Structure formats: C-alpha cells, structure tokens
Amino acid sequence: MPMRKRHFYRLLPLASLLLAACTIPVSKGPATSPTSPQWRQHEQQLQQLGQFETRGAFAYLSDKQKVYARFFWQQTSPERYRLLLTNPLGSTELELVVQPGVTQLTDNQGKHYVSDDPQEMIQKLTGMSIPLESLRQWILGLPGDTPNFTLDDKYRLKKLTYQQNGVTWVVDYQEYNTQVTPPLPSRLELNQDGQRIKLKMDSWTIK
C-alpha cells in the first residue's frame, strides 16, 4: 500500500507539467501587428499602385437577390476608375465610370445615368449595396480608413472590420496572387448584415 502512494505522488508533478503546457498561451508573433516594419513596407508598395487592372468573377448574394457576373476593374488614377460587369454571354450588365465629382452609369439597356455618388446610384438602380469608395482600397489589400484589421503570417491583410453610419462591413482575404509584385488578393469576401459580395481576381495588370 505505501508503495502505491509513493508512485501516485511521483505522478502528480508530471501531470501538473502536462496541464501547464496545455494552457501556455501561444504568441501570435510580429506578423499580426499592424506596426510591424514588414507590413509598413508592404502597405507602402500597395499605396504606390496608381494604375492597375484586374478581372475575374463577381457574386452578390442577399435574401432579396443573387447576382453572378464577370467583372473588369480599371484604375487609371487614385480618383478615376471604371467597373464593368458582364453576363456569361459577354454582354454588358453594368458599366460604371467614376471621375472626380461625377459618375456615369450605363445599364444593360444602354441607358445612361449621372450622379456624384456612385455607391448610392448603384444601390438605387440595381438594389446592390456595394461600398465602392472603400472597395477601391480593399481590392488591393489595403485597410482604407479602418484601424481594425489583422495580418496573416506573410504580413498581408487577413481580415478587416469597417464601420460607418451604423453599417459594419467585414472583409476576409482568402487567397493572394504571389505571381505579381507586391502580392495582391485573388479571393476576398465582404459581409454586411446578410449581404455577401465575393470577388475572385483571375489576373492583375500593374502599370
């Protein structure tokens, strides 16, 4: 009987060590810090991309509608860009041309609309809520105006949360294209109160 007690007591320190090992917090490391020099360098490279083009697949999903299209985004300057949505047959569903102070939208009937607010115009004409002003930054992998973001282990944007006027958008970066320099997103998803926007970038052209 005494022998069993001594054996039991000898096991207690070992068990305590095992429990302690299971509860030791794992450090996330410097990659998740927005103040890391690697992120700052990557961010500066992205901010210098004044002209670029990307094309791929677009999906807008909500309780009221589901829209699937091909998209083409052409940025010619920080304040000038063109967004084209086409159907599987290649016909234009929507073309948006944004310049400082004026936005022109052309629908699938060839009708033209002019406004100074591209996001509001698209929502009124199509029912889709697309945060275009922020999307210009997010599509490159930049957080834009939000300080609420995390990085992956390669010092790239992983997830962000953006709040404005009572509306919260959550953006998840699911994949990056490492064949271009700097690496740019190839798949991302935006979520806002039951609405989802999925973007898959098949190619990037940097000018």
From Swiss-Prot:
Keywords: Cell outer membrane, Chaperone, Lipoprotein, Membrane, Palmitate, Protein transport, Signal, Transport. One of its GO terms (cellular component) is cell outer membrane. InterPro entries: LolA/LolB/LppX, OM_lipoprot_LolB. PROSITE patterns: PROKAR_LIPOPROTEIN. A lipid is attached at C22 (S-diacylglycerol cysteine). Residues 1-21 form the signal peptide. It is a lipid-anchor. SUPFAM superfamilies: Prokaryotic lipoproteins and lipoprotein localization factors. The keyword Protein transport applies. A lipid is attached at C22 (N-palmitoyl cysteine). GO terms for biological process: lipoprotein localization to outer membrane; protein transport. The keyword Transport applies. It is found in: Cell outer membrane. Belongs to the LolB family. Monomer. Plays a critical role in the incorporation of lipoproteins in the outer membrane after they are released by the LolA protein. NCBIfam families: lolB. This is Outer-membrane lipoprotein LolB. The gene is lolB.
